């Protein structure tokens, strides 16, 4: 939540007590001294003593009803008390005294804007500007009115004029930061927030908005410091605590987030945003009963709040009540939620209604073009449907989407965009999982062909494997591990941005033949000899990284595969690593599965094992990518709604010519997949074609 907040235009010195004493001395000598009464009223207003402020302003009016500033002051303090009608009358009286009074027009503009009437406010602000062309506050007011109507570019022009007229006014920088963020110029917005803070170090709203933008950029340490400063300066501001809680929750610091939310709840227990944040915190720790309870509290207090309705849809989606979720998201859209269309697109996607999902995501981007998450969801749908030209471009939004990159890497050198390298050194680095590194390292040779030297930085488990890449063996690239300091480089590019740079389409996926290979290694020779009755040696993997949020859909329990292990003529080898490998001990006594990966040090060892097999059968894991990259026949078992890279309703994939895809016919139904694989394994023709080594 980033906020545009303004403070009173009155310039009140910081030492209010001393100022009040000075005015009081004047009033002791002359209780009807107008200037002192006006000054005391403004001091009381700045000190949040509203009753005293009104009393002093009325005394000033009584002393000098013919002087416009007394009525303007009365209007200002009445507006601060929420007495809108009386404030309007006071400003109108000031104009009756002097129709050319710019301050009275300014006051009416502020009044109209506070009433939610920005167009009416513009009329008064412009009149004020005509009376006093150098009035910075009038430009600020015009900017506020335009910003409230989402006319941010026009608002920025007026904020800049205000800044030229009053370069030391912190509010000008603050307001420029606000609209620049809305226009997508995040770095410029951050710079202006910092300037506002430099001019006024206690500017709590600037600290808060700075923290929000830094969080969106993944600069979490600096964001936390800014938000902590904001809540220190303004401890009763619920929005500051909410933003800090959101940051902590995204860092999975749940106990701290809960502690901060308690502070927000203590301040405003009826605040729907606080209640929704409590609901989201329960969802993050998978406490669905608690989440539903907080949602009900939110609904009781704000039943027509668009984000409350949107959150209801999120909970329904989380429980896989997809049709209900899509309907709830549609209601949230009608109420004005900017994120609900993207959420509806996700529900439609999970129901297999791809074209409707695409339309919803396109609509979401139109409504909220600056949202990284919205554009990222559109990208995944486009890639899934084969629209790679647009999909790769939109996929770049992942760097601004914290769910994908909570702490993105920052380099001092430029990002490579595909230009000739001319002998420069370029860092290509893995950014997501092991399988992604294996899938996209094929592009390293294409980058080197642009005339530079490639430094390939990958996860430790695949570092040794990458030495088998032809571009590394030729000396045109070297390999280093993530977390290590790489050799000096001139340019950088993440591996998963390379398909966009090279304009990859479904028809032009680079496949130079198998591009990863096993080194000569004792592992390959340690496999048991093929049994007399076994014609096929098959490797199996059934589970991925359990930390991946969609792992419950792509992974299975080992016992699900038991029917395959009873097929005669097949010798089975486990390629499974991680916690799921412990399931080997629970196999029935009549089933035997060699633990081929138990002693693997890394994926180079796994590659040596795969090289000795005839076939690999796996769920969507790094093993699928490794076998495919080696040119080994691989059967990939996929959930009903698989990852975008396997596209939709295809038995094959352009990424790996030797891969066959076995997709669930209905969500969660692995039994049909087992039946199809068993049929293929027991068909003599199918089994026989696996035995010869593949040639490319």
Language-model regions, residue ranges each:
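Alpha-helical solenoid repeat scaffolds of the TPR/TPR-like class and their adjacent stem/linker regions
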Residues: 1-615, 620-696
